UniProtKB/Swiss-Prot annotation:
Biased composition (Basic and acidic residues): 293-326, 347-365
Region annotation (Acetyltransferase) ranges: 1658-1790
Sites bearing Asymmetric dimethylarginine, chain numbering: R32
Disulfide bridge partners, by residue number: none
Protein name, entry field: Germinal-center associated nuclear protein
Taxonomic lineage from the root: Eukaryota, Metazoa, Chordata, Craniata, Vertebrata
A Pfam family reported for this protein in Swiss-Prot or TrEMBL: CID_GANP
Listed GO CC annotations: chromosome; cytoplasm; cytosol; nuclear membrane; nuclear pore nuclear basket; nucleoplasm; nucleus; transcription export complex 2
Gene: MCM3AP
Organism encoding this protein: Homo sapiens
Protein transport among keywords: yes
Catalytic activity: L-lysyl-[histone] + acetyl-CoA = N(6)-acetyl-L-lysyl-[histone] + CoA + H(+)
Length: 1980
């Protein structure tokens, strides 16, 4: 098999499949016109194109050969192709089954060295096993050597073809091939040798044949020799193959006999073979292979009833058997077919010779005109092959179209010539046989098959319809002539402009027409119409006259275009790839070099040129058949889309909206991205410049991520199709180049993320926009590729950072697969243990166990992409969950249960109730009134899973852009790249990217010259013919557009094609033409149209002359007007130029500044890069050190392990020896002990026997045989006569009894009594001790004292709330340890006086255990302690959690105490996990139910007998460290308590735990409480009043007008906005305060109400505070009249009051203020004008704003009632709570700063000073510009005494530099003296008077320190001070008053004096700093 063959399933035989549909007239073309043509069908050729309209492609079973569209070909001595062009077919006799030579067209240069016996034929037919192989022959430079034969006379028939309509894929009627592949040359073609014969005839050719000679087992091919022809015939490119306009070669079938046989055949045999070859054709079975995805496949003529012809199955003859047997052998085996073909050629040449002479003479008149439309070949010959005719094309159509082209070239009246030529060529076709009509001028909206079929179907039965919208025409075929005539008569009613003509298939008079069944019903058109060739022309004909070398693309070029059929790739026996490459390099380099400089103006021309370049390069490529030498493709494309594809898709209008220039349909080369092309069997191997390397792929993906991913404003369908298609293209390039590295992995990962995102984002889109199944398939392919790449990289030692993420995605995508866990176990340990894979495994467990609660919780906690994958299972899990709920909540099938719909929405994570209702209804359940009726019998399972909707919970997770999601992180920078262009600014091809792609040639092609009869006229004689291209090159890729011939002809091409050997015979007489009435009517119509056109041209010429005369008269008037207007325009232009010059200078300055900034930036970047380099070096060093350390550690561990193993071995051996010894010793001791025990046992038995005998003997001796009959008191004496009687008391006390002779007996009666009494006493003591101990152990804790003692800090009121978290002990027995501990812990925190009955909470929620409210002392301070204890049993239900959040049970909690249940010893890990998970669930429920801030401390009580690892086990089981890191708890401690309550150890532990909780409780909140009115007033007074009144006083004392009202109002509103933001801060919402149990409605200073920080309440407070704002007011114009200004002021004041009742109050105040202003102004103006009044600057705007503010504060009412009723206190006030520190963050608005700065500037100008100490008021002081008042007072006094003093500016205006310097020094000295004097006076006053803070007001500094601001009564005298009064008298009076009121000691005076001095210094420093800051601001 051939590894490079795209059809690897084919054997290397010539034509191994019978399904290849190749013939003259295949009845069903397998593709629509404009699509890629499968080889073997007629490729449609546009009449406007000079190249191919399709590139034929064929399936794997096809055995056809490909023909390349190269125009220049030089055959080496091994070439065995004979160049022939037939009338209807171009067939080549190929004698080899190896890879057939790609037929090329160009200068006719051949070099045949080896002699061979070849017959020359006018028709070049290819021999093959079947009619499935074509090798189009191209003409090169011919040098033939023929041995003359006397009877071999051939006359080429070239006059019947019309070049614009001829296609380049011409199929011979007979095909033969020979099975045995030859190895005579790399091309595999047999050599030829022709004797060269020269003839002066231009129309006939004599050929001589010699017996063929076999060379290297190759059969000879037949190649004709043609004599040189004159220059005139050569230049008629569109008409002639060999230079004649009418001569054409027809193709004939050739017998499969051996070539060496004599050529004997009859005419009948030739004709029969021709007809058989034509008729035996069938369409290809695989029609649509290789078609583009977006191309329309419905317009194929195959859908319109084309009748298939029979298959052609010619015999195959050769020296060796065929490589593969043909599939069908149904053709009758005829004999001497080769001879019949020769005879038919003889006769055909004789018949058409005369017609060729006539046409040759006729075309001599317009040779010069035709040359302008031909290819411009510098010094070369233009007699090259014209495009071949497609089989089945009508000769009449060819002639008519050809004549139209000739007329256009002549520039003469062409229509008459066209008609004459058309009618002359009708031949034997009768008008009654025409069954088709042609409709012209059809509008686009009517030019549709459906509309036309409906229209003509009403008239007659339509067979088929072909449309061409670009030409506004359509061809309609009927079944008979009568139907066509009726349709032609009545069909014009469709549209008024439509014209209908007969559509006839014209047949050449020199050929017998084939029957309709034998003809292919389509011509070579690009459009769907197959029979409208005569009406189409080349689009490149216009550009041909403009371009020189670029005229290669001209349709009317005389170059014979090669066939569209591709040269099929065969595998020869053996050939050297190096020699092949060297031989094929010469013509490739020359061909590519000739393309340089070719002009291609349009995108279509550029595409054709680039396509021709690619085809040449494909032919020059070395085809490797050895797998060992196979190499991986390496892409070299630098653009996101290859250049050829950009032009191709622009030509075909296949551009996306993201790739075009906005507003046009032109391609945006910078935005075009390579389109995905589906792989097919007929595709060529890609060239390097068609593949993008990895950096370009990465840049392409970056472009898609940054520029496309987030552009979803338009159609989602276009967006998804574009991104999906382009990412598939990236993946295909990766696959073709076999890329595998981390960057490649990242590209595939981004593709995967895109598909995961679309799986959820596009799930609601219709099937036409998004197919989830296809998306999942692509996602699966991406994940599979990633899996393989991860494995390959891991084998190389490379680990990918995102492997765990995508392995997790793979698991999530396969949750329904049963063996997914087995695949997970095969992951790398690091991947398997990652959080992503663990999450996927958890999802698998939840889905397969139908744990829908767990599943949806995982969805809520998952990342966005994980959630998108889990979204695919929503329908499945919801269906299973609904089934489980329906079964669980219903008793039987007869009874239904009502279930709340909200619960379903919450549990199954629906978007809303509507979506849940739809889902439930789909499953047969009824929903009504917010509830669903669960019923087992009504439950239905719909077929399949319903289409899920987008989930809002997943959408919320998309917190970043889609690009960042797909990129997996922040977006990369936007890629910048300039696309590569192979054309310069003059649209000339420069070929920049070709050098790197051509193979290096080591062999120069041989040169051979041929003399010709036209060398003098056509140019320089050629020196070296172009060698043949390698014939084993891969077939070109299918292309649905015409492929332009791009190889330019070189000057070295021979001027002639063939040299005719004998003078031709005279041509036969022309046939008599036949005309019909319809033809005459058509001619008349055309004559009328031509006459009308000439008349219109005359009228237009007269009108143009008149217009020219009128323009001449108007020019004089125009000159006068221009002269008058020029002066004004010049002035305006001069002014504009001046302004532009200024702007230019400003821009230069800005550029200089930008350059400076750029340099600084570069410096910073260099420093940063150095820093990064150092950091990177350190990081690398750290990594190497870490690796070294890890290696050393590993070695040390291994060494230590070996040592340990050795030591363990020794220990084990010693231990075993010890065990053996112990066992032996034990056995010995055991035996000895057994013996001793045996001895002792028998000895003891002996002793017992002896004792028993003694006792029996004593009893028998002492005890009577019967009881004695004596009194009880005498029985002792009777029994023991010798005993003591009575018993002595002393002996009895001693416990002795004297029995006389029997001895003394000791008794213990009293001792037993004493022992019993003692024991009973001790038992009583122990009982009471245990009872007391139990009472103490069960006693309640003194919580108030504990809290007061251990609470950090000092507080007067303490609120402490503890939550006990107890296990669920309801199901345990009363005697169980866990229940006892829970009850005991509740008793410890209950207390007698503090216990309460919590009836508000049910048993499943949180209960209030106790409340304490008492006074406790801490040191000498009494503290009010309020303690609340809450208790929670077990895990809370959802309803209980909702109740907790609603009732705010956990609000204000200060600590948590968790009691774990006693742990049962068990080895089952599942039970242990359940134990810890239940405790963790209970704890997390409470932590999540409480407010987020603050985090609480946690105490964990563990009942255990004791252990070392208890604390570690608790930390791991409850994940306490994670809770701390998540800020759910602040700290924790684990306390072990005994599991039984029998001592005080448990109480001590609990006491310590409470102390720890109190000491670690959250700090109390620093909240301030004020009423709303008080808060607003204090805030305004603190931030607004000081600034406002100071500014007002400063301006008044400085004699300035009032401040602008806009700045004052903006300052006031800014303060209110600040106050509103403080009181409604978002951080208040998360505070867990107050304690719910102690809070009161309306709130208090200690505790706010429960809803104080609710978002609704805070929003209401913000709105209420903002309700104090004033509306904006702009200052009226300075010259505004008084009355309108007053009206405006009154109207503004009317907006302030909140009610109509208070509006008159403010209105009267405003009117009073205006009246006083008017009176003051009137007093200054003795005789005011009527209606006049104060100016705008004289109106006291500050007083007006002050009145409005005061009224607003007094008259304010809330906009509406508070949201909650608890916000109102008992007295109707609303308390607000805020942080005190937040009030210190106010920033003064910029407008007020500017207003203050303007005030300072105005004061400076007014006082005539250059600089004064500026004022910068702080936030909480009221500085007053008294220094200014003092200076103004002094200046006013001096001016009153001395008159006006000139200002400083007046004095310095005319001074010199020395005078200015002296003036500056003098002024500086005066300032210093004045400052010194002021300080001395102030100090003297401080020392002399005891005024302290009540010193001289005029001497106060401008900048008051903080220490003096508190003396607010210093403002009062200033408020009353008038400018006209004496400051000294006021000062003395105030000082006396203060002196009388102050009676302080001397020490206090000194301290106060020191404080004043310090404050003065601070004020000076602050003043200087502020002044410098203001000066800097001014400079900026």
């Amino acid at each position: 098999m051939n590894p490079t063959n795209p059809f690897s399933g084919q054997q290397p035989s010539a034509f191994s499949a019978s399904s290849s549909n190749v013939g003259t007239l295949p009845s069903k073309p397998p593709f629509r016109f404009g699509q890629p043509s499968l080889f073997g069908q007629n490729s449609t050729l546009s009449g406007k194109s000079s190249g191919f309209s399709q590139v034929s492609s064929f399936p794997a079973s096809s055995g056809v050969s490909h023909s390349s569209s190269v125009q220049t070909l030089g055959f080496t001595q091994t070439s065995s192709v004979g160049p022939f062009s037939g009338l209807e077919h171009t067939s080549t006799f190929v004698a080899t089954s190896g890879p057939s030579s790609s037929s090329v067209l160009g200068n006719t240069g051949f070099s045949f060295k080896s002699p061979t016996s070849v017959g020359a034929f006018p028709s070049t037919s290819a021999f093959g096993q079947e009619a499935g192989e074509i090798v189009n022959s191209g003409f090169g430079k011919t040098e033939f050597s023929f041995k003359p034969l006397e009877n071999a006379v051939f006359k080429p028939i070239l006059g019947a073809e019309s070049e614009p309509e001829k296609t380049q894929s011409q199929i011979a009627s007979g095909f033969f091939t020979f099975s045995h592949p030859i190895s005579s040359a790399p091309g595999g073609l047999a050599p030829f040798s022709f004797p060269q014969v020269t003839s002066s005839s231009a129309t006939t050719s004599n050929f001589t044949f010699s017996k063929p000679v076999s060379s290297n087992n190759s059969l000879s091919a037949f190649t004709p020799a043609l004599s040189n022809q004159n220059v005139e015939e050569e230049k008629r490119g569109p008409k002639s193959i060999f230079g004649s306009s009418n001569n054409s070669f027809s193709s004939f079938p050739v017998s499969s006999a051996v070539l060496g046989e004599p050529f004997q055949a009859s005419k009948a045999g030739v004709r029969q073979g021709c007809e058989e070859a034509v008729s035996q054709v069938e369409p290809l079975p695989s029609l649509m292979k290789g078609l583009k995805r977006k191309e329309d496949q419905d317009r194929s003529p195959r859908r319109h009833g084309h009748e298939p012809a029979e298959d052609s199955d010619p015999l195959s003859r050769g020296d060796h058997p065929p490589d593969k047997r043909p599939v069908r052998l149904n053709r009758p085996r005829g004999g001497t077919l080769f001879g019949r073909t020769i005879q038919d050629v003889f006769k055909s040449n004789k018949e058409v010779g005369r017609l060729g002479n006539k046409e040759a003479k006729k075309e001599t008149g317009f040779v010069e005109s035709a040359e302008s439309d031909h290819m411009a070949i510098p010094g070369g010959n233009q007699s090259v092959l014209a495009p071949s005719r497609i089989p089945g094309v009508n000769k009449e159509e060819e002639t008519e179209s050809r004549e139209k082209k000739e007329d256009s070239l002549r520039g003469t009246p062409a229509r008459q010539s066209n008609r004459s030529e058309s009618t002359d060529s009708l031949g034997g076709l009768s008008p009654s046989e025409v069954t088709a009509i042609q409709c012209k001028n059809i509008p686009d909206y009517l030019n549709d098959r459906t509309i036309l079929e409906n229209h003509f179907g009403k008239i007659a039965k339509v067979q088929r319809i072909f449309t061409r919208r670009s030409k506004k025409l359509a061809v309609v075929h009927f079944f008979d002539h009568a139907s066509a005539a009726l349709a032609r008569k009545k069909g014009k009613s469709l549209h008024k402009d439509m014209a209908i003509f007969w559509h006839r298939k014209k047949i050449s008079p020199n050929k017998k027409p084939f029957s309709l069944k034998e003809k292919k019903p389509g011509d070579g058109e690009v459009s769907p119409s197959t029979e409208d060739a005569p009406f189409q022309h080349s689009p490149l004909g216009k550009a041909a006259g403009r371009t020189g070398a670029s005229s290669l693309l001209n349709k009317s070029s005389p170059v014979k275009k090669p066939s569209l059929l591709k040269a099929h790739q065969f595998e020869g026996d053996s050939f050297d790839s190096a020699s092949e490459g060297s031989e094929g390099l010469g013509p490739c380099v020359l061909s590519l070099s000739t393309l340089i400089g070719t002009v291609a103006e349009t995108s279509k021309e550029k595409y054709r040129l680039l396509d021709q370049r690619d085809r040449i390069m494909r032919q020059a490529r070395v085809k490797r058949t050895d797998l060992d030498k196979a190499r991986t493709f390496v892409g070299t494309c630098l653009d996101m889309c290859p250049e050829k594809e950009r032009y191709m898709r622009e030509t075909r209008s296949q551009l996306s909206v993201f790739e075009v220039v906005p507003g046009t349909d032109q391609v945006d080369h910078a935005a075009a991205v390579k389109e995905y092309s589906r792989s097919s069997a007929d595709q060529e191997e890609p060239l390097p410049h068609e593949l993008r390397p990895l950096p370009v792929l990465s840049r392409t993906m970056d472009y898609l991520v940054t520029q496309i991913m987030d552009q979803k404003e338009g159609s989602l369908r276009d967006w998804y199709d574009f991104v999906w298609n382009r990412t598939r293209g990236i993946r295909k390039d990766i696959t073709q180049q076999h890329l595998c590295d981390p960057l490649t992995v990242s590209l595939i990962e981004k593709c995967t993320r895109f598909h995961i995102h679309c799986a959820h984002f596009m799930c609601e889109e219709p099937m036409s926009s998004f197919d989830a199944k296809i998306n999942n398939e692509n996602m699966t392919k991406c994940l599979q590729s990633l899996k393989e790449m991860y494995q390959d990289l891991r084998n190389k030692g490379v680990f990918c950072a995102s492997e765990a993420e995508f392995q997790g995605y793979n698991v999530l995508l396969s949750l329904n697969k049963g063996d997914i866990l087995r695949e997970v176990q095969q992951f790398h340990p690091a991947v398997r243990n990652s959080s992503e894979v663990k999450f996927a495994v958890q999802a698998f467990a939840a889905l397969n166990s139908n744990n829908f609660v767990r599943f949806f919780k995982l969805v809520q906690s998952a990342s966005y992409l994980n959630a998108c994958l889990l979204h695919c299972y929503f329908s499945q899990i919801r269906k299973d969950a609904l089934r489980a709920l329906n079964f669980a909540y219903t008793v039987s099938t007869q009874r239904s249960t009502i279930f709340p719909l909200d619960g379903v929405v919450r549990m199954l994570l629906f978007r809303d109730c509507e979506e849940a209702t739809d889902f439930l209804t789909c499953h047969g359940l009824t929903v009504s009134d917010g509830c669903v009726e669960l019923n087992r019998s009504a439950f239905l399972e719909p077929e399949g899973l319903s289409k899920t909707r987008k989930s809002v919970f997943i959408t919320r997770k998309l917190t970043v852009s889609v690009g960042e999601i797909v990129n997996g992180g922040p977006l990369p920078p936007v890629p910048r790249h300039t696309p590569v262009c192979s054309f310069n600014s003059q649209n000339k091809y420069i070929g920049e990217s070709l050098a790197a792609e051509l193979p290096v040639s080591t062999q120069r092609p041989g040169s051979d010259t041929v003399g010709g009869g036209r060398g003098e006229e056509c140019g320089v004689e050629p020196d070296a013919p172009l060698s043949s291209l390698p014939q084993s090159l891969p077939a070109p890729a299918p292309s649905p557009v015409p492929l332009p011939p791009v190889l330019a002809l070189t000057p070295s091409v021979a001027p002639s094609l063939f040299q005719l050997s004998v003078q031709p015979e005279p041509p036969p007489p022309e046939p008599v033409p036949m005309y019909s009435d319809e033809d005459l009517a058509q001619v008349v119509d055309e004559l009328i149209q031509e006459a009308l056109q000439r008349d219109c041209e005359e009228v237009g010429s007269a009108g143009a002359a008149y217009a020219a005369a009128a323009l001449g008269v108007s020019n004089a008037a125009m000159e006068d007007l221009l002269t008058a207007a020029t002066t004004g325009i010049l002035r305006h232009i001069a002014a504009e130029e001046v302004s532009k010059e200024r702007e230019r200078r400003e821009q230069e300055r800005q550029r200089a500044e930008e350059e400076r900034l750029k340099q600084e930036r570069e410096l910073v970047l260099s420093e940063l890069s150095q820093g990064l380099a150092v950091e990177l070096m350190e990081r690398v060093m750290m990594e190497f050190v870490r690796e070294t350390c890890s290696q050393e550690l590993k070695n040390a561990v291994e060494t230590d392990q070996r040592v340990r193993v050795a030591r363990c071995c020794e220990d084990v051996c010693a231990h075993l020896v010890d065990l053996f010894l112990v066992e032996e010793i034990f056995q010995t001791a055991k035996e000895t002990l057994q013996e001793l025990q045996c001895f002792c046992k028998y000895l003891q038995r002996w002793r017992e026997a002896v004792t028993a005998r003694k006792k029996l003997r004593r009893q028998m001796r002492a005890f009577p045989a019967a009881p004695c009959c004596v009194d009880v008191s005498d029985r002792l004496r009777a029994l023991a006569p010798s005993a003591e009687c009575p018993i002595a008391e002393e002996n009895l006390a001693r416990g002795l009894l004297d029995l006389g002779h029997a001895g003394r007996l000791g008794i213990s009666c009293t001792r037993l009594r004493r022992l019993r009494n003692k024991t009973a006493h001790q038992m009583k003591v122990q009982h009471f001790y245990q009872q007391l101990l139990s009472d103490v152990a069960w006693a309640s804790l003194d919580l108030p004292s504990l809290v007061a003692e251990h609470l950090p800090g000092r507080q007067e009121h303490v609120f402490w709330k503890l939550v006990l978290v107890l296990p669920d002990v309801e199901e345990q027995s009363p005697e169980s340890c866990g229940r006892i501990l829970a009850n005991w812990l509740k008793v410890k925190f209950m207390g007698d006086e503090g216990s309460v009955d919590d009836t508000s909470s049910d048993a499943g929620g949180i209960q209030t255990l106790s409340l304490f409210n008492s006074l406790s002392s801490k040191g000498d301070q009494m503290i009010s302690v309020n303690v609340c204890i809450k208790v929670a049993h077990g895990a809370l239900s959802d309803g209980a959690i909702d109740a907790v959040e609603t009732q705010k049970d956990l609000l204000g909690a200060s600590g948590l105490m968790l009691l774990l249940p006693p742990k049962m010893k068990s080895e089952d890990m599942a039970e242990e996990d359940v134990y810890w998970l239940s405790a963790l669930l209970q704890l997390k429920q409470l932590l999540q139910a409480k407010p987020f801030q603050p985090a609480l401390p946690l105490v964990v009580l563990v009942p255990s007998p004791g252990g070392d690892a208890v604390e570690k086990e608790v930390e791991d089981g409850l994940m306490l460290q994670d809770l701390v890191s998540a800020k759910l708890i602040s700290d924790y401690t684990v306390t072990e308590i005994p599991d039984t309550i029998n001592d005080l150890q448990g109480s001590t532990k609990v006491l310590q735990a409470v102390q720890w909780l109190v000491s670690h409780c959250p700090h109390s909140l620093d909240l301030c409480c004020q009423t709303l009115i008080q808060y607003v007033e204090d805030g305004i007074g603190h931030e607004f009043s000081g600034r406002f009144f100071h500014d007002r006083r400063e301006r008044r004392l400085g004699g300035l007008a009032s401040q602008e009202p806009g700045a004052i109002i903006e300052l006031f509103n800014s303060v209110l906005q600040f106050l509103a933001s403080v009181v409604s801060s978002e951080q208040l919402c998360d505070l867990s305060w107050p304690v719910t149990e102690f809070a009161e409605a309306g709130g208090s200073r200690l505790l706010p109400h429960l809803h104080w920080n609710a978002p609704e309440h805070l929003a209401w407070l913000k709105q209420a505070v903002l309700g104090f704002q004033l509306p904006q007011m702009d200052l009226p114009p300075l010259g505004a009249p008084w009355l309108p200004v007053c009206s405006m002021v009154v109207q503004y004041a009317s907006q302030i009051p909140s009610s109509r009742q208070t509006q008159p109050v403010l209105q009267s105040q405003v009117e009073n203020l205006l009246h006083r202003t008017y009176c003051r102004w009137k007093s200054k103006s003795p005789s005011p004008v009527h209606g006049a009044g104060p100016s705008v600057m004289e109106i006291p705007w500050d007083d007006l704003i002050a009145l409005c503010i005061n009224h607003k504060l007094r008259d304010w009412t809330p906009p509406r009632l508070p949201v909650t009723s608890e916000a109102l206190s008992e007295d109707g006030q609303i308390c607000v709570y805020f942080f005190k520190n937040d009030l210190k963050k106010y920033d003064v608005p910029l407008s007020w700063e500017q207003a203050r700065l303007q005030t300072q500037k105005e004061l400076q100008l007014r006082e005539g000073r250059l600089a004064i100490k500026p004022f910068h008021p702080s936030a909480n002081n009221f500085p007053i510009p008294l220094l200014h008042m003092h200076r103004n007072w002094k200046r006013s006094t001096e001016c009153a005494q001395e008159g006006r003093i000139p200002s400083t500016e007046d004095l310095m205006r005319g001074a010199s530099a020395e005078e200015l310097l002296a003036q500056c020094l003098s002024s500086s000295l005066l300032l210093e003296k004045e400052e010194n004097k002021r300080f001395e006076d102030q100090l003297q006053q401080w020392l002399s008077e005891d005024s302290g803070a009540f010193t001289d007001l005029t001497s106060l500094p401008l900048y008051l320190p903080q220490t003096l601001v508190s003396l607010s009564h210093t403002i009062e005298p200033v408020m009353k001070t008038s400018v006209t009064t004496s400051p000294q008298s006021d000062m003395m009076r105030e000082q006396l008053q203060l002196s009388e009121a102050t009676g302080t000691c001397l020490g206090e005076r000194l301290k106060h004096l020191e404080r004043l001095i310090r404050s003065s210094r601070e004020e000076e420093v602050a003043s200087e700093l502020h002044l410098s800051a203001l000066l800097d601001m001014v400079d900026i």
